[in-house]
Each structure stands twice: as C-alpha cells, then as structure tokens.
C-alpha cells in the first residue's frame, strides 16, 4: 500500500503496479534508458537484468536479458545515451561494458584497486566516469577501454559520480563529507562543496538543467545545492538514511519532484519547490536502495535489499 499524505489538488498518488523477482540477492541499482524503453537492474547476485518497458501494457516491465560475468556483486549500472551499451561497477574492482541487445560482454575496464562502486556515461557516451572504495574517480575512453585520467578525488570511498548534461563537468561524493565538481576534460577540481557539518555523503547527482546538485547525506537528509553560489537552497527530510548509499532522483514528467529510497522500506516523494512530502510508497520489505524515474511517463522503479524491483505508476483517473 502507498501511505496517503493529504493530497495537494494537483497531485495524483502513485500505486504499486508490478514486482520483478529476477534477482536472488539485494538490488543495488535501477536505471531507465534515456528513451524510457528499457529498465536495467543490478544486484549483489553478480548479475544485471534488463526489461522492456511498455506503459500501455500490463505488465509494464517484461524481462529481456541477463548479463553475467562479474566475479562479485554489482553496485551500479548505467546506460549509454543511445541505450546500446550498459556499464556496470562491481566489488570485483572492475567495470564491464556490455552489449544491451545481445547481453554479451564487450570489454572489462581494469584499474581500480578496491570495489568499483558507482559509474555513469557522459551524454555523448564516449566517456565513462567511475568511483571506487580506492578513493579515486577514474575517467575512461569507451572505444578503447583505456583509463584516461585518475583523479585523487577523496580521502574516503567515493559513493557517486555523475556528468552534467553537456558532459563538461563531473560531480563526485564521498564518505569524507565532500562533493567535488571536476572539469571532465582536464580532470581539475573546479569546486568543492562543503557544508558546516559535513556528514558522509551517500549520493549526488546533477539536476536535469545542470544548475543544481542533489546531495544525500547519512544524517537522513537530502539537500539541493546551487552550483554557482555553492550554497544549499532546499532540504528534504522525512526519510531514513543513516547507513546505506541510497539513490535519489528528479521526477520531471508531472511537476518537479524529488524521489528517494529510504531505510524505512518506503519510496519517498517530495515536491521540489515547497519541500513538502507528497507520498510514501509502501510495499518493499527491506531498505529501498535506489530509485529511477521514467523520462517521459509518470513511472518510478525502485530496488531494494528485499531482492525485488517494484514498478509504481500514478493511479488512473
């Protein structure tokens, strides 16, 4: 059930639509392709799964492909912009690049000296950025699989990495309490965002317009930072995040929202501007580790320690 919070007139609550049970260990990452036609999930069971997404049909998600080859659990997965490739980050210290259609392994990117924890493509999809428990951020050439740059980014494990919308900047976060913004061409640090308290940062991502970053910290808080002023503008609370690196997302298909996983087993959704908690989506039986918002439809995917992926849709009027 989705817990109802008194609705604002314009908000239609989300409801549980489907549960995917392809994985046999915790689900660590869920991502939609940029065209919204595919969903990928990665797991501690060492596999990635893809599903076709058809919002007209029931069920919405249909399993397509299984990707196997990592020697240890997978922490993150990302699609290339054209959805031809997937990259994964694993506790086996490697990244792997996969062919989405065939499920075959294209290449293994070797260089990190500890768990590879987070990964993303740039919008042009000719570069990959990764973060690791070895405290570095690495930039890779997709075509050759070679490491282009090693950034001595942080003094603790790197928890998230993301490119902005034109690929010129990278943001990284770490348990060291810092978010850093890097020039992706030179590898130079152009800005460090520091809060007064600096709790460990569990997640970071650029806003769709690239002007803001959404930062999750292990004090049960999400903050929206303005990059140019290096000040935080808004704070979102009500969820629980004190232990895990839980992802959050921007939902832009029907008003501007912030969506996050939580250690209370719910998906939380806030109105971006008012910071009002709109809804808690109930159904998972363990921590919700990650969420993804569909690019064009009012559709959310969530992955949990309970080994399932859940699909949530807005109630039909």
Swiss-Prot record:
> What is the name of the gene encoding this protein?
WDR5A
Q: Which GO terms describe its molecular function?
A: histone binding; methyltransferase activity
Repeats (WD): which ranges? Answer: 22-61, 69-108, 111-152, 153-192, 196-235, 238-280, 283-317
Gene Ontology cellular-component terms for this entry are:
nucleus; Set1C/COMPASS complex
Q: Do you know which SMART domains this protein is assigned to? A: WD40 (SM00320)
Protein name per the record: COMPASS-like H3K4 histone methylase component WDR5A
Q: Which domain of life is it from?
A: Eukaryota
Instruction: List localization entries.
Output: Nucleus
- Give the residue range of the signal peptide: none
Tissue expression profile of the protein: Strongly expressed in developing embryos and endosperms. Expressed in shoot and root apical regions, and in vasculature.
Arranged from A to Z, the UniProt key words for this protein are:
Methyltransferase, Nucleus, Repeat, Transferase, WD repeat
Primary site of residence: nucleus
The alphabetized list of GO BP terms reads: methylation; vegetative to reproductive phase transition of meristem
Tell me how this protein assembles: Part of a complex composed of TRO, RBL and WDR5A. This complex is formed during both vegetative and reproductive development. Interacts with SDG14, SDG16, RBL, but not with TRO. Interacts with ATX1 and K4-methylated H3 tails.
Deletion consequences:
Eearly flowering. Decreased TATA-binding protein (TBP) levels lower Ser5P Pol II levels near the transcription start sites (TSSs) of target genes and of Pol II at the genes 3'-ends thus affecting the transition from transcription initiation to transcription elongation. Significantly reduced trimethylated 'Lys-4' of histone H3 (H3K4me3) levels at the 5'-ends of WRKY70 and LTP7 genes leading to reduced transcript accumulation.
Q: What does this protein do?
A: Forms multiple COMPASS-like complexes involved in histone methylation by interacting with different histone H3 'Lys-4' methyltransferases such as ATX1, SDG14 or SDG16. Binds to target loci chromatin, increasing H3K4 trimethylation and causing activation of the gene. Up-regulates FLC and MAF4 expression to delay flowering. Present at the promoters and at the transcription start sites (TSS) regions of WRKY70 and LTP7; this occupancy is ATX1-dependent. Involved in the transition from transcription initiation to transcription elongation.
């Amino acid at each position: 059930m989705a817990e109802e919070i008194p609705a604002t007139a314009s908000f239609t609550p989300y409801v549980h639509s489907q549960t995917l049970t392809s994985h046999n260990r915790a689900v660590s990452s869920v991502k939609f392709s940029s065209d919204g036609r595919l969903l990928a999930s990665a797991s501690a069971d060492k596999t990635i799964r893809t599903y076709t997404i058809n919002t007209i049909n029931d069920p919405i998600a249909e399993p397509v492909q299984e990707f196997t080859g990592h020697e240890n659990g997978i922490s993150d997965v990302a699609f290339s912009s054209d959805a031809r490739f997937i990259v994964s980050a694993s506790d086996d210290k490697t990244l792997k690049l996969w062919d989405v259609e065939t499920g075959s392994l294209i290449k293994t990117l070797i260089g990190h000296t500890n768990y590879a924890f987070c990964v993303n493509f740039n919008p042009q999809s000719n570069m990959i950025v990764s973060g690791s428990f070895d405290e570095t951020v690495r930039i890779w050439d997709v075509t050759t699989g070679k490491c282009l740059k090693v950034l001595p980014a942080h003094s603790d494990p790197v928890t998230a990495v993301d490119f902005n919308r034109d690929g010129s900047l990278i943001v990284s976060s770490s348990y060291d309490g810092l978010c850093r913004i890097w020039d992706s061409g030179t590898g130079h640090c152009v800005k460090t965002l520091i809060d007064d308290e600096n709790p460990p940062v569990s997640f970071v991502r650029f806003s769709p317009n690239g002007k803001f970053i959404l930062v999750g910290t292990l004090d049960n808080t999400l903050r929206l930072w303005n990059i140019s002023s290096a000040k935080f503008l808004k704070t979102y609370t009500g969820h629980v995040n004190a232990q895990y690196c839980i992802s959050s997302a921007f939902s832009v298909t029907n008003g501007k929202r912030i969506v996050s996983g939580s250690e209370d087993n719910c998906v939380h959704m806030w109105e971006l501007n008012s910071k009002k908690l709109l809804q808690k989506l109930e159904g998972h039986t363990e921590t919700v580790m990650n969420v993804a918002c569909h690019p064009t439809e009012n559709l959310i995917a969530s992955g949990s320690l309970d080994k399932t992926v859940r699909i949530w849709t807005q109630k039909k009027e």
